[in-house]
UniProtKB/Swiss-Prot annotation:
Chief location bin: secreted
Main function: Probable ion channel inhibitor.
Key word Calcium present: no
Tree of life domain: Eukaryota
Name of this chain's protein: U8-theraphotoxin-Cg1a 2
GO molecular function: ion channel inhibitor activity; toxin activity
InterPro entries: Huwentoxin-1
Length: 62
């Protein structure tokens, strides 16, 4: 009985972590990731990244 309760608790915790990670990924959509091109007219670089000039790629930013 104790083992079943522990499995249920760990299963719910894993489900919560998975849904949290998915939600974070969905909020970051629409931005350019590390070393992606960042030409004008494209979405901006993701948070923490900056577009470099003249190479126009997203790198760790200011």
């Amino acid at each position: 009985m104790k083992t079943l309760v522990l499995f249920i608790i760990f299963g719910l915790a894993a489900l919560f972590l998975l849904s949290s990670a998915t939600e974070l990924e969905e909020t970051e959509r629409g931005c350019q990731k590390f070393f992606w091109t960042c030409h004008p007219g494209q979405p901006p670089c993701c948070s923490g990244l900056a577009c470099t000039w003249p190479t126009e790629i997203c790198i760790l930013g200011r």
